[in-house]
Design a protein with these regions (language model features):
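Bacterial Sec-dependent N-terminal signal peptides
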Residues: 1-25
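Phosphate-group recognition and catalysis centered on beta-loop-alpha active-site segments
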Residues: 20-259
Length: 259
């Protein structure tokens, strides 16, 4: 009898978790906060505070940049250095000696993702930075990134982006269901489609120079994003072209145009 009750409880619990996952609804407003929302309400870029601000604003996504330390820890930071210390050449313990301006410690990618997983509205746009040491190290970072996301069961929160095409291909090799967009701007929509990418995420200048790529991408079932779009004129142009996402340091301005 007790076994039947326990079995019924387990089946109910699993069904509830499955239902919650199926009902997970992320925002669909196109607004991707670049390095989090950090400018209008000042926060350090790529900090947990800037992520929380993007979540509180209701952004569709919050972008963050990931490097790997000398001792193999994945950390969120835009530049190759943190307070003058080269991230790839320093241990995480060494990097922790210099906190962010708001007092936060330099966040690990794991801490950033766990913070994002406390809600179901804002996706996490995980930029895997190309290694400045070697291509092999970039591949290792890609592998560790996918392993981390899988360990945390965070796949539904994560879209990957990268400037290194081989890193993108590595992510897709390890997780063929992953959403991976390419940043550099030197691939056509057809090339991206052929290699299994989710879409392109190109500089606004590149998108304006190749406006036909927007329709081509959509015809192929790919998504279109542009970075870093801070001018209202460019935002309006992209909205008229019905792009899927707009990455900006000025999410407040973009929200004012879409509401």
């Amino acid at each position: 009898m007790i076994q039947k009750i326990l079995l019924t409880f387990l089946v109910t619990a699993v069904s509830l978790l499955h239902s919650q996952a199926q009902n997970m609804k992320f925002h669909t407003n196109k607004v991707i906060a670049h390095r989090g929302a950090w400018k209008a309400a000042p926060h350090p870029q790529n900090s947990l505070a800037s992520l929380q601000q993007a979540i509180d604003m209701g952004c569709e996504g919050s972008e963050f940049d990931v490097w790997m330390t000398a001792d193999g820890i994945l950390v969120a930071n835009h530049d190759a250095d943190h307070e003058g210390m080269m991230i790839e050449e320093a241990t995480y313990a060494e990097l922790l000696q210099k906190p962010l301006p708001n007092g936060e410690k330099l966040p690990t990618a794991e801490a950033y993702i766990k913070k994002g997983m406390t809600q179901h509205g804002t996706k996490l746009i995980f930029e895997i930075k190309p290694s400045q040491i070697s291509k092999e190290r970039g591949q290792e970072l890609a592998t560790k990134s996918v392993e981390l996301v899988k360990k945390l069961k965070a796949e539904r929160w994560i879209d990957y982006i990268t400037f290194d095409y081989d890193i993108g291909l590595k992510v897709l090799e390890l997780d063929p269901e992953a959403n991976v967009a390419y940043l550099t701007g030197d691939k056509t929509p057809q090339e991206l489609k052929d290699d299994g990418f989710f879409g392109f995420d190109y500089n606004i200048r590149t998108v304006k120079e190749n406006p036909q790529w927007i329709e081509e991408a959509h015809t192929l079932g790919l998504t279109v994003n542009a970075w870093t779009v801070n001018q209202e004129e460019d935002m309006r142009w992209l909205l008229e072209k019905k792009v899927d996402f707009i990455t900006t340091d000025e999410p407040e301005i973009l929200f004012s145009l879409i509401k």
